[in-house]
Amino acid sequence: MKQGLLGLLLLAGILGFGAKQAQAHPHVWITASSELVYAPDGTVTGVRHAWTFDDMFSTYALQGLETKTKGVYSREDLAPLAQTNVESLKEFDYFTFARAEGKKQKFLEPVDYFLDYKEGALTLHLTLPLKTPLKARQLALEVFDPAYFIDFKFADKDPIKLVGAPAACQLKLQRPSDGTAEAQKLNEQNFMSGDNSNYGAMFANKISVECP
């Protein structure tokens, strides 16, 4: 069993590519869908993610995992891997960054997390409760890896939903551009400064919600 596989790969990428950060590019690809969860009184309580990993990462992650039926992996079979991966993602803030009325918000540790395996791909499901549930007229959420070791792309169908939100709330998703020109400029700057700590920000998926 690979303990904290995703976290270990992230650390290896960040540390191993430290001298080559000007050439940052993704090594893991995730197709994401998310839900912003509201309480009956209109309070935002958290974010529910479903992250489907690329086939190559999924295959590698499952190497050495024995099951009763070859090629079939139940939630129970995948539970240890789900737990260790969720724990390892803590230091990366779960790649989820929220602001309400412009003020940064913090998340508690994930709940209701599990892995499932369908059609050759692993999907990690997790819910991030807000440390302080709140009502906000303006809520901004970004999902990305600052080091750009992981590329997040939101699904074409139902990429983001509001669950239990007041009917008048308006949701927008701004997908990242390819960032080619910006990346080249930033690469040149990073080559001089050696800083690539927030390279992935230009590839962030930006979600905004406005409620009256």
Regions found by a protein language model. Give the residues of each.
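Positively charged n-region of N-terminal signal peptides that target proteins for export
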Residues: M1-G4
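Mature, soluble, non-transmembrane domains
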Residues: E101-P212
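Bacterial N-terminal signal peptides
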Residues: G7-G16
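Structured domain cores in non-transmembrane regions
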Residues: M56-L134
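Early extracytoplasmic/domain-onset interaction patches
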Residues: P26-F53, F57-T59
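Short solvent-exposed loop/turn micro-motifs enriched in small/polar/acidic residues
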Residues: W29-I30, K90, L108, M202
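Sec/Tat signal peptide C-region and signal peptidase I cleavage site
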Residues: G18-A24
